[in-house]
């Protein structure tokens, strides 16, 4: 839309970009429904808009100015830093995904495997589902 986004409620005047991958692969996430409720936005029909099956397509659409997307910082941090995207609100959904490291008991004792698992835990501890990007 042509209207500025000053409050979360202003999103009703803009095209929302839906990441179907997010909804399928992040248990308990309903995407926009959950974020809008967290932001205290009265219900409206947010189902219209653009729907993509790949998160990177959602981000690309937002960069092209096609709408507003919920995205992960891990995918959009460079675009945010370089000004191709902005985060209009400081409101993040909690991370609900899981990351699993599976190996055999013998290989679990390998120092390289232990180092990898420590690194994976450190990386995963900073993951979150992010606020909208426009």
Spell out what each predicted region is.
Residues 99-109:
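A bilobed periplasmic-binding-protein/Venus flytrap-type ligand-binding module shared by bacterial periplasmic
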Residues 1-66, 71-96, 123-134:
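C-terminal regulatory
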Residues 108-122, 128:
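Short amphipathic alpha-helical coupling segments at ligand-binding clamshell hinges
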């Amino acid at each position: 839309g042509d209207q500025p986004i000053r409050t979360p409620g202003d999103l009703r005047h803009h095209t929302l970009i839906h990441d179907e991958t997010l909804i399928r692969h992040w248990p308990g996430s309903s995407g926009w429904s959950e974020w809008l409720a967290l932001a205290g936005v009265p219900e409206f029909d947010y189902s219209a808009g653009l729907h993509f099956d790949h998160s990177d397509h959602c981000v690309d659409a937002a960069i092209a100015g096609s709408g507003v997307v919920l995205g992960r910082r891990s995918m959009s941090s460079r675009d945010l830093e370089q000004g191709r995207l902005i985060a209009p609100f400081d409101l993040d959904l909690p991370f609900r995904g899981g990351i699993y490291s599976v190996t055999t008991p013998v290989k679990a004792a390998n120092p390289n495997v232990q180092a990898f698992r420590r690194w994976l835990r450190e990386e995963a501890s900073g993951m979150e589902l992010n606020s909208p990007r426009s």
